[in-house]
Amino acid sequence: MEIFHISAECYPMAKVGGLADVVGALPKYQKNAGNDVRVVVPAYDTKFKKENNFECVHWGTVKLGNFNFPFSVLKESSDKLGYELYLIEIKELFNRPNVYGYEDDIERFLSFQIAVLDWIIARNKVPDIINCHDHHTGLIPFLLQFAYKYENLKDVKTVITIHNGLYQGWFGFDKLYYLPEFDLKHIGFLEWNNCINSLAVGVKCANAVTTVSPSYLNEINYSANGLESLFNSVRNKSKGILNGIDIEIWNPLKDQMIAANYSIENFEIGKQKNKEKLCEQFELDPSKPLFSFIGRLFEEKGGDLLPQASALALSEHFEEINILILGSGNAEIESQLTQLRNDYKGNYNVFIGYNEELAHLIYAGSDYILMPSRVEPCGLNQMYAMRYGTIPIVRRTGGLRDTVIDFGDDGNGICHDQASVGDICYSINRAVKLYDDKISFNTVLRRGMAADHSWERVCQEYIEIYNLIIQQK
């Protein structure tokens, strides 16, 4: 079947979070399974775009109300990604370094969605499936069904995959005229709390709804930033599918970004070499257990808990542990974490920002990864960590609940229930004791490394959903 994935992010073209990793991996495995797969994202001004070759396969003009924006469809020439990657180039709106955070984001992603559909209908070939990802593409199922200009695409089956339901793409009805013409009797599909809610539109109109873990599907039925009743009403067309990870990229045996390669058979030597390299870089002691955090420094990820939790844990275990933070986000949290460097030099360090190569080294060189998330629809970091023999310390929520079992229950990690400084510190205390028991520590570590988080299983679950909705009239 022919499958289109439409997304705001796709690794390695543009990455802000886990959305990019999923959209960069799932299509590759779907193509390996014999499908014709295309990924479409905006043409941001990124390093990948500058360093790779593209050919223009279509051009046109997006009409956004009274505004007209020329656009081009650029195809990545090498096909080295394992699927066909297309960029929608609207220079006035997307020739910028960042993915999000602009005042005209509504206009940017509306124009992107319209340009995608304008191109698809111009191909004179109707795809079997369009899989939309998050609110940035949530209007596509509505436009396919009801916009006059896309009449010939109305039978295309659509799936919307929710990677994070907190972000919903709200905008007012004063911008309704941006949309291609449709019969106003269908306007109710757009409305949610007297506004247009892009995510809600997608959930209402798509043939199927998926979330990125089974537990997250359950959680959004009682906590979804105002959409709880909607998610309850569409349970019959919804499924939670736990994400996989790209085990070709995330492979400690072949990873070129780490100091020494290793496998489950010889992890002790390999991890120690990576730990020494990492600790040398950040002036830490490689003989102590290393607790690391990789992620965005926001409340959603528990980032606001890290300064106090780090300070308390270091005060209690100053001679026993190291803590390393890699992340960016809230300026106040960044400042607090940076200030700790002076108080706990030699046991603590922080890198404000994000660096992919450094992230790989941290997964390889750390003993524990901290994930105190308040919300974690799936979470990929815990899977990356386990793949590299680093034990996750997590709060039980979303995909963390589905992937990490406490070592007290013969599991692969350390779990707590509350998003609190106290629970984080208690888990660190347990981790220190576990680290001192090398036999038990290595047993937990091996369980994580042995887990199967590959995309083959995930790919098949998506294909089953596609086949099911294609059969529906």
Swiss-Prot record:
The pathway entry for this protein reads as: Glycan biosynthesis; glycogen biosynthesis
Q: Name one GO biological process term.
A: glycogen biosynthetic process
Q: What class of enzyme is it?
A: transferase
Q: Name one GO molecular function term.
A: alpha-1,4-glucan glucosyltransferase (ADP-glucose donor) activity
> Which UniProt keywords are given for this protein, alphabetically ordered?
Glycogen biosynthesis, Glycosyltransferase, Transferase
Record's keyword annotation contains Acetylation: no
Task: Tell me its EC number(s), please.
Answer: 2.4.1.21
Q: Which residues bind ADP-alpha-D-glucose?
A: 15
* NCBIfam families, per database record: glgA
* HAMAP family hit by this protein: Glycogen_synth
**PANTHER family for the chain:** ALPHA AMYLASE DOMAIN-CONTAINING PROTEIN (PTHR45825:SF11), GRANULE-BOUND STARCH SYNTHASE 1, CHLOROPLASTIC/AMYLOPLASTIC (PTHR45825)
The role this protein plays is: Synthesizes alpha-1,4-glucan chains using ADP-glucose.
What name is this protein filed under? Glycogen synthase
